[in-house]
């Protein structure tokens, strides 16, 4: 991570940290870096979610892009994966999404996609950051016909919707409850599932600029759980603000998280011989029950650090076509280059339809172990060296011995704060509490900030 770019672009409180001035510079410098080797006039797609700050940042960003001679296609409100899809299929130089994903409305973010539809590589982000920090802006300033042009492109939404529908199957007879988080999916999910002939019920479909992710969406599925029960829906589907992740609800109202969704789709692909290298890419935070279910099914796994960018990196480097996170980021590389909540939802419904099984039946193959995570404030200089402290290493080894293979412990530093994260999984809540609390007490004693 750099000074400006985090794991998912540039983020901050809109008009305070992520200002129009910064958005203009990101457009100008980002557009230049991503198009400097183009032989024809570069084309860049720009989209946003429904936040009140979106149009302000969009205007500034587009002005920056136009100032370096780029032809900008303005998509309006569109899901993040829609930008990725259009960049690839319309052969654009780059794409930009203005969104802070599952964060509240006061935040916003700007993330770039290269001409291959993937998020930027670290070296490209560092090149943009170098221009941001340069004492003087020395980039070309074209005039007259050298300036960029702006094209309103509402057709982009229709093309993305049509693509989504082509990946699905006829859902006649199926009732689907949707929660579009008052976000980007609110302009597309209804139409897509109606085109697939599903009966639908929808909440979180009335964005006002301030209510994105507010008590709705993948991080707040409680209303969707109630809607599923009230309507007798076969499944519920909750997206986040930019629709790059999905959390599902089965017909009984129970949550089906990313681990279970990935397993269900992975097993289906594996049985059809369509799972590349018969392997699923997941992160260190995936539940132990997920790993045991994969082992039972004979599916291999590749494990990465937390973050969908690391999952995608492993998929690209090793040729895998399915990966994701417990949080609901699911990447199906046969169709798109980034997490896509609506695409994942369609594939999940397809598995249900083609197997004739309910979502609760499909999800029951993964027994989710109780999981507890505690964040402990420690000396920043020690967070990466905790395992070098004998008392900490010894207590972790002791707890793992007691688990005897029927549980899991993960101790890792925060990437951004002076915190050590202690996580455990075990068959019962009482066991999880015991393992985490025992380790946490030793960590606090040895390297905690309060000592």
Swiss-Prot record:
An annotated GO cellular component of this protein is: cytosol
- A GO term (biological process) for this protein? peptidoglycan biosynthetic process
Q: What is its EC number?
A: 5.4.2.10
Family annotation (Pfam families)? PGM_PMM_I (PF02878), PGM_PMM_II (PF02879), PGM_PMM_III (PF02880), PGM_PMM_IV (PF00408)
Keywords for the protein's UniProt record, in alphabetical order: Isomerase, Magnesium, Metal-binding, Phosphoprotein
Q: How is it modified after translation?
A: Activated by phosphorylation.
* Catalytic residues of the enzyme: 101 (phosphoserine intermediate)
Function as written in the Swiss-Prot or TrEMBL entry: Catalyzes the conversion of glucosamine-6-phosphate to glucosamine-1-phosphate.
* Identification of the protein by name: Phosphoglucosamine mutase
**Native source species:** Streptococcus pyogenes serotype M12 (strain MGAS2096)
